[in-house]
Amino acid sequence: MPPPGDQDCARRRSRRRRRDLLLSQLCFLASVALLLWSLSSLREQKELDLMDLIGEDRKWMVGRKLMQVNDTLTSEDAGLQSSKNCTEPALHEFPRDIFSNEDRRQGAVVLHVLCAMYMFYALAIVCDDFFVPSLEKICERLHLSEDVAGATFMAAGSSAPELFTSVIGVFITKGDVGVGTIVGSAVFNILCIIGVCGLFAGQVVALSSWCLLRDSIYYTLSVVALIVFIYDEKVSWWESLVLVLMYLIYIVIMKYNACIHQCFERRTKGAGNMVNGLANNAEIDDSSNCDATVVLLKKANFHRKASVIMVDELLSAYPHQLSFSEAGLRIMITSHFPPKTRLSMASRMLINERQRLINSRAYTNGESEVAIKIPIKHTVENGTGPSSAPDRGVNGTRRDDIVAETDNETENENEDNENNENDEEEEEDEDDDEGPYTPFDPPSGKLETVKWAFTWPLSFVLYFTVPNCNKPHWEKWFMVTFASSTLWIAAFSYMMVWMVTIIGYTLGIPDVIMGITFLAAGTSVPDCMASLIVARQGMGDMAVSNSIGSNVFDILIGLGLPWALQTLAVDYGSYIRLNSRGLIYSVGLLLASVFVTVFGVHLNKWQLDKKLGCGCLFLYGVFLCFSIMTEFNVFTFVNLPMCGD
């Protein structure tokens, strides 16, 4: 395990980077809201035609909701429903808004949009700074392996907003907003994250076939099971239980991932492809031994922009002696570990190595002149293969030169150790500055002050209600952090769904469309930005695998767990009814997106580049357009119009 100081430093830098990307996230959400508002006029034009198309044979659909648990209606309810040819909005399940519908149409809905965006930001802060650290402490106390922890607690931490949105959709709104959010988030994670990483990574990244195929195959099985269960527009108790059991099987697969991977390599003869699926690795003496320095020390063949500092390329050309923690980090980014673990370990390793290279006295202007201390037996010439000259060292230097460089290196190491100690002291002094903002300590700088003022209400509330278990004096209170952060995630998710429901009702947009577009983007954009940061450092393989692997939790637990609680615990023997028949088409597109993505990666020779990125973003646009038009009854009748005031 890496030192606690390295873990804290990596987490703080990741959280600060995600806060810096807040503006781009809000702009993206605003553009999605504008698109939905422009498309709402299409629904208003078709409402009159739909009223004529609704016949007597469709009156049984009137007033259906997601949580209708039986088909028995009283005569009074039947008469009330038969008199309506519209769907009751989920807005009535929430407290009354202070603005009327007319006020919102005149411009007050902008306040609800801003409030929803603020809830997106609040969820990201609570999950990153409080909820996930508390889950890490729980995993440490339970002595869980990295595989099981990544597939259970860490997956719950990254998908907490989607899970709570689904719970609210089942037990409160009794609509399709939860299902739409998870379906839209799943497509966003597959197509949009891969597309953004391919366009803006600044390089061509090779992808590992094992991780992509493993997660894609099981994810495909999950989506197929979901399609089969919702095809008849209702979900029974045993169907929801099957979804939960499938996730338990996924945990077992991750537990024995290394053994399964070895069998896969033996069958495909792909042994030796350890990092990013690279097939053209340099040969190394004594390859039978497991050497942690092999990982990420082979130079990749990719194109990059000059503005991107490639840490792994510098390490390939100028390796150094690894400490125990550094060797552990490099082992844990191999394909023997789950995507969640690999993504986390890669982020920590990249930050540590880049900081080391920047702080090195010999590292100037992007060119490293660090002397490499390598035994003569394993001398490498030009970094490509074993040297044929017995009296030559690294890059053609003689043994005498190596001895002299070794003496100089010893002196440099002593100086570097002193510099590292000073750097550690500086990092300890900056501990309070990084991480979540504190309400009583405004930062310096105009931009930071604006961010601090923007987040002050959130920081004030969290400062007094959620202990920060990252700090040593609050570390023992990690269970309190877990409980309080869970409550805040539930509260923020409730506010988020409430605001989005009001926005959809005001613009005449169904709840399922708001879930597929606005809620899905709001809960997934932070993960997209984090994956982009990792992909720009050459770790696109882990970003892609993480985006697909996290969807397994969303489908099997995000939907299966709330359904199982309702049909087994709350009302045993009941079933879940789906309000929108268009969801089956959206889930079908979700399944198609998996096949198209894997097939596109295969045709692109398992490389992530701009061409693949553009294709994925185009497919995501097609999915949004098709889903929106389907829910608006453009192709066929799937939804009754929403009831007015």
Swiss-Prot record:
Abundant in the brain. Highest levels found in selected thalamic nuclei, hippocampal CA1 neurons and in layer IV of the cerebral cortex. Expressed in dental tissues. Residues 404-435 have a biased composition (Acidic residues). The keyword Transmembrane helix applies. Residues 44-106, 173-181, 231-234, 508-512, 573-582, 639-645 are extracellular. Residues 128-151, 203-209, 256-486, 534-551, 604-617 are cytoplasmic. It comes from the Eukaryota. It is a multi-pass membrane protein. The modification Phosphoserine is found at residue 307. This is Sodium/potassium/calcium exchanger 3. It comes from Mus musculus.
